[in-house]
């Protein structure tokens, strides 16, 4: 199967997993990126079975609306049963690197609210150690140079993602060459840097369920 076919298969597995648990009051959290887009397109076929969705980015909100799925502000939602999103890297502890699409902060907020965080990815995203994929860090623009210097002290090589402005009006530094050992500790250290909004390590709140699309079918990992 091609990579797109693997993404579609794992997106279908996520739909199949949540559908029996949805009702006409259910609101689904939806992530951002190519795999999440497959999930949206497949979920839309069942839009009569749930109330609507919370989007982790403006792009996702637009895609949901195009399918006729109501999009809710997270502040108006009292309960979020599921959040489904992709990842740039994942390990066996279901800790993730996310943010290749620059939506990491809103993704992290929705994941924090959801009872169950389901990560969907093709099998190539499963790694022994996180960090080969550059770690995105969302930064207040005026703090960019300061944050970059602090990230160097942590052993990284930050690169400004030129021309990218997040939905929150901030900029992204992609941190290369980080050897990520204990991911929750590093996530906290980076978040403590003044000027950092959030970073793409999802380790303090990892996924609850990881669905991996492989040539042998969809594999399931849980915490």
Swiss-Prot record:
GO biological process terms on file: D-ribose metabolic process; pentose-phosphate shunt, non-oxidative branch
Entries under PANTHER family matching the protein: RIBOSE-5-PHOSPHATE ISOMERASE (PTHR11934:SF0)
Species the sequence originates in: Stutzerimonas stutzeri (strain A1501)
Identification of the protein by name: Ribose-5-phosphate isomerase A
A Pfam family that the UniProt record links to this protein: Rib_5-P_isom_A
Enzyme class (EC, first level): isomerase
Chemical reaction(s) catalysed: aldehydo-D-ribose 5-phosphate = D-ribulose 5-phosphate
Catalytic machinery residues: 107 (proton acceptor)
InterPro entries per record: NagB/RpiA_transferase-like, Ribose5P_isomerase_typA_subgr, Ribose5P_isomerase_type_A
């Amino acid at each position: 199967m091609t990579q797109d076919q693997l993404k579609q298969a794992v997106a279908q597995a996520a739909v199949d997993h949540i559908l029996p648990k949805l009702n006409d009051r259910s609101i689904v959290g939806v992530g951002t990126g190519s795999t999440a887009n497959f999930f949206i397109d497949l979920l839309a076929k069942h839009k009569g079975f749930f109330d609507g969705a919370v989007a982790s980015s403006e792009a996702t909100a637009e895609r949901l609306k195009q399918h006729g799925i109501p999009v809710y502000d997270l502040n108006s939602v009292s309960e979020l049963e599921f959040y489904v999103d992709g990842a740039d890297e994942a390990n066996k502890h279901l800790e993730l690197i996310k943010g290749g699409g620059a939506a990491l902060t809103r993704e992290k907020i929705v994941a924090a609210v959801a009872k169950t965080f389901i990560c969907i990815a093709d099998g190539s995203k499963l790694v022994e150690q996180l960090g080969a994929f550059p770690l995105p860090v969302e930064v207040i623009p005026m703090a960019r140079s300061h944050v970059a210097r602090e990230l160097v002290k942590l052993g990284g090589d930050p690169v400004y993602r030129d021309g990218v402005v997040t939905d929150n009006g901030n900029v992204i530094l992609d941190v290369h060459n980080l050897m990520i050992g204990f991911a929750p500790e590093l996530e906290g250290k980076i978040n403590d840097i003044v000027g950092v909004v959030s970073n793409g390590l999802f380790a303090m709140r990892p996924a609850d369920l990881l669905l991996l699309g492989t040539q042998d079918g969809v594999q399931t990992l849980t915490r």
